């Protein structure tokens, strides 16, 4: 259909401008923001510069009347310092974030010079002081020796009294010598008796373990082999005696015979011996 009308859509111009504005904002947000602040390396140097410029700001207030001079200068000084602080960066940091401990090249140079002076001073003292110390030590030792030479201790003499008549002292010594001689002689006389007693005591001490051992053996073997009860008739023996009225009495030695028992192991340890009984004693 050739005669039919065609529809044409026309975009308003303000829509194109809005779209272009949104695209430019997106590009700005995507690209990193450029820092237009002045880059500095030392906060201390900037502070010194502000103090130097503050003098010129003070001179600008000379033309103002006195009523408004002081507040106007204070506001101008604050505005100037704030503007400088906002438009500079200290090592990439803002003024408030930067620290005051940054050293300038001049400060480092001064510190290096002071350090070199200290090293030279220490090296000089190391060479000079040992000699001075040695001299002082030698002088001190010599002074001590001189003091010891001048020291003389005070010695008070002791008065010794001489006795012109030594006879009483000789008599006293003689009496004491006789007494000591008597005591020594008595001690020498009693010495053999003491030696004999000591030997007897030592023999008793040596026999004590033997007696104790014999008792132990006797108890052990008597418990192993117990003898039967013997009748009292076996122990009765007739003993011939003479009456006490007779003047002459014959000595008679009689042997008491025990009843022989069978051989047992304790015979080896304790053999029986015939015992003689003397009736005269």
Curated annotation (Swiss-Prot):
Q: What is its main location?
A: nucleus
Keywords attached to this entry: Cell cycle, Cell division, Centromere, Chromosome, Chromosome partition, Kinetochore, Mitosis, Nucleus, Phosphoprotein
A single GO BP term for this record reads: mitotic sister chromatid segregation
Compartments where found: Nucleus; Chromosome, Centromere, Kinetochore
Check the record and name the InterPro entries matching this protein.
Mis14/Nsl1
- Where are residues bearing Phosphoserine located in the sequence? 4
Q: Which domain of life is it from?
A: Eukaryota
Binding partners and assembly = Component of the MIS12 complex composed of MIS12, DSN1, NSL1/DC8 and PMF1. Interacts with KNL1.
| PANTHER family attached to this UniProt entry | KINETOCHORE-ASSOCIATED PROTEIN NSL1 HOMOLOG
Report the protein name in the record. Answer: Kinetochore-associated protein NSL1 homolog
| Species whose genome carries this gene | Homo sapiens
């Amino acid at each position: 259909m050739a005669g039919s009308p065609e529809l044409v859509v026309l975009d308003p111009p303000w829509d194109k401008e809005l779209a272009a504005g949104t695209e430019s904002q997106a590009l700005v947000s995507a690209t990193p923001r450029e820092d237009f602040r002045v880059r500095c390396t030392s906060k201390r140097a900037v502070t010194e510069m502000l103090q130097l410029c503050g003098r010129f700001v003070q001179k600008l207030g000379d033309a103002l009347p006195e009523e408004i001079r002081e507040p106007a200068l204070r506001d101008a000084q604050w505005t100037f310092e704030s503007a400088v602080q906002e438009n500079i960066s200290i090592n990439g940091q803002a003024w408030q974030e930067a620290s005051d401990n940054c050293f300038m090249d001049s400060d480092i140079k001064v510190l290096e010079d002071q350090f070199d002076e200290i090293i030279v001073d220490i090296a000089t003292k190391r060479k000079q002081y040992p000699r001075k110390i040695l001299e002082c030590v030698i002088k001190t030792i010599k002074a001590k020796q001189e003091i010891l030479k001048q020291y003389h201790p005070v010695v008070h003499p002791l008065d010794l009294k001489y006795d012109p008549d030594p006879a009483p002292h000789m008599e006293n010594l003689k009496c004491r010598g006789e007494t000591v001689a008597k005591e020594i002689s008595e001690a020498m006389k009693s010495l053999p008796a003491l030696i004999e007693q000591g030997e007897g005591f030592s023999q008793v001490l040596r026999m004590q373990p033997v007696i104790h051992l014999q008792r132990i053996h006797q108890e052990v073997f008597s418990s192993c082999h117990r003898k039967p009860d013997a009748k009292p008739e076996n122990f009765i023996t007739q003993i011939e005696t003479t009456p006490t009225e007779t003047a002459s009495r014959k000595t008679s030695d009689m042997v008491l015979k025990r009843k022989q028992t069978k051989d047992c192991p304790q015979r080896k340890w304790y053999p029986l011996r015939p015992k003689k009984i003397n009736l005269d004693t």
